[in-house]
Amino acid sequence: MTRQYFGTDGVRGKVGTSPITPDFVMRLGYAAGTVLTKSRKASSRPVVLIGKDTRISGYMLEAALEAGFSAAGVDVMLAGPMPTPAIAYLTRALRLSAGVVISASHNPYEDNGIKFFSASGNKLPDAIELEIEAALNEPMSCVASEKLGRAKRLDDARGRYIEFCKSTFPNELDLRGTKLVVDCAHGAAYHIAPDVFHELGAEVIAIGNQPNGFNINEGYGATAPAALVEAVRANQAHLGIALDGDADRLLVVDAAGRVYNGDELLYIMVKDRMRVRPIEGAVGTLMTNMALEVAFKEMGVGFARANVGDRYVLEVLRERGWQVGGEGSGHMLCLDKHTTGDGIVSALQILSALKRSGLSLAELTQDIEMFPQTLINVKVEPGFDWKKNKELLAEKEAVEAELGDKGRVLIRASGTEPLIRVMVEAKDADIADKMARRIAAKLSK
């Protein structure tokens, strides 16, 4: 069955434009509620937890979802502004039927979305999402008055989640003597992340912690690191941590103002775990720098590539039975700590590696040199299939033969625009650039 509404990360779009409208979101709540009701145990009544980020539209969409669930006979608990991974954790910890997050992650405030978590704190299986889509095609009705769902606030959501985050940091370590700048992107972690690090002993300077409904991700957060770099330097901090709007991704800045991306953070995590207890392998994506693949091989650590997107990294981790993965954008997964990507928890793993080793970020990454990457986007006609272009395939094979084990080629179509992305990695930047241009030229004809 073809998906009509659910993408790789729930339902998302511009507020006021289908499908992110009040009437659709109410129907979505009702459809999800009917699916939950069918699968519930005979003696139990479904209970769903709803959280949101700081977008102004969150109020409207929260009310619409609540109405839909209530009409389906599902009780609702409202957590208010909370990070996406917090809803995953609380759904599991409170033994609820499902969790729902109203967020568009790193997108601007005009966008919003709805994503679901199962009772186990994992993203919904494809089969359940398809059931919900099928239910959306049925007319919406309402259960009898005596069966309507109730709604109440979850008053201690913030405190519960703060304690959970702290529990993922080693008991024998603390952050005393560490000066941190924490950038909350004016998003869902604005009232949580600074306190987590402070309660572990750090001196915390918070920025991007004044949400007004319209400024989420604007000039702050993991997708706009300039503010963090400036604050780290101005405050002479040891480290800076930037989250995105729903706090499921991060990037880190050192005292010198250097930004460390997800590939470098994954390397640090794996290296630290190997120091404590050897691990079997780690998962990156098709875009993960080849330097990690080489380094992990030398360390005796397996490495697998997933499609781009944390959902696919998670799938491969589960298939392999591994625990650590991530992508360059800063979505990190530590399945020995949490069921989903969590920016705060991931930051704590980096901080524990620093504390345990007594080294700086620069020192922890000095033995790995990232391969230069050249990425060229080539506009094509909609529907163009590059895999049927014989000249392109021949050039790709020729370049791969010349690079050998000293580089790699990746060609993929954009999922959102009529573009073909050509990426070449090589130990030498000039070679990477030259090879990428050779391949891209075959697309430009």
From Swiss-Prot:
Q: What does it catalyze?
A: alpha-D-glucosamine 1-phosphate = D-glucosamine 6-phosphate
Query: What is this protein for, i.e. what is its function?
Result: Catalyzes the conversion of glucosamine-6-phosphate to glucosamine-1-phosphate.
* Name of protein: Phosphoglucosamine mutase
One MF term from GO for this chain?
A: phosphoglucosamine mutase activity
GO BP of this protein: carbohydrate metabolic process; peptidoglycan biosynthetic process; UDP-N-acetylglucosamine biosynthetic process
Family affiliation: Belongs to the phosphohexose mutase family.
Enzyme class, spelled out: isomerase
Which GO CC terms are listed, alphabetically? cytosol
* Keyword terms: Isomerase, Magnesium, Metal-binding, Phosphoprotein
List the active site: S105
* Binding residue positions for Mg(2+): S105, D244, D246, D248
This entry's comment on the bound cofactor is: Binds 1 Mg(2+) ion per subunit.
Annotated positions of the Phosphoserine modification: S105
**Enzyme Commission code:** 5.4.2.10
* UniProt PTM comment: Activated by phosphorylation.
Q: Tell me its cofactors.
A: Mg(2+)
Mind telling me which Pfam families this protein's record contains? PGM_PMM_I, PGM_PMM_II, PGM_PMM_III, PGM_PMM_IV
Q: Which SUPFAM superfamilies match?
A: Phosphoglucomutase, C-terminal domain, Phosphoglucomutase, first 3 domains
Disulfide pairs here are none
